[in-house]
Amino acid sequence: MAASPEVGAWHTVARRKKGPRSNNSPHAAARQAKAGLDQPDARSTSAKHPIIKNGRLQEPLSTPSQHQSHLAEIDRTYGRVRTAYTSSPSYAALEALVRTHAASHAPITRAICLGNGPLHAPDSSWDRRRAANIQTATFLALVELLTCDLFVGSSSSSHEKKPRIRCIFQEPLYTAADRAYLTTTLGCEVVDDPDALEHVTEDSLVWGVHMYHSVYGDILCRVAEPAMLVGTPWDVWDALPPDEDGRVAESLKGLAKMDASAEYDLFAFPQDEGHFTFCDTGIYWRRNRTMAAQDKPLAAENHVGENDGEAGPPEKEAQG
């Protein structure tokens, strides 16, 4: 698919033509790690040696005062990050993308967010906490733009509304404070790993930034054609050296099929300035099937009309 001209800071991504594989990219090591080529498969690497039981982080119980303190800290951090993001060129580019293409692409009624990392983790570095907060803020900003609901995910407005698009979060490393903040303050749902997959439908936005190959495989095995998938595009995976046992290639069959489908457009995700938060991230957005179905009869009618108006073979001149 040919790339379209840029509008602002975003553009449609051209599918990469087949050619020699290269491993010289500055992000090659990170891509190999993400593909599971140099470490065990996992759904999150946000903390050191966490104890996960039944898809949920096991952590020491907090006192009520500690819990409230954690919530206040999350609110301060998330509020600062969200305010900075919604004032940034990255947000403006995302807004332009959605406003331009929403009418011609699939509508979304629910949004599933996978593996953003914990908003509040005592042993987590600031970079990781910032990444978790900016991804969460960006995910909810995208939901806002898709619903034109300017209050979704904003805890500072006295007129705050619950999102019309149902938002479901899954992150095994969420703390109790993270869960409380997402559900009580932001009006979202949090489920245990891997229950979020049960909520994926063809009208879903699935958010999986920097996930392992098996996660994309699980998503697209359940629902082959979600309305939108935000994650690592096929060409990034395809540029990796082939794995010996074919495990990665098998997991990514669904993504390769989506990438090749004429039903999907692929857009580069607007970058988080000065950070690698959304490097190698794209938006697969399915075209609106209802509009496509309506366009077919119209195109056929126009084709018939054009044929009716075509000049036939020249008539022989009357001979006197």
Predicted segments — roles?
Residues 2-9, 17-38, 43-44, 49-110, ...:
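Domain-level detector for long C-terminal conserved domains
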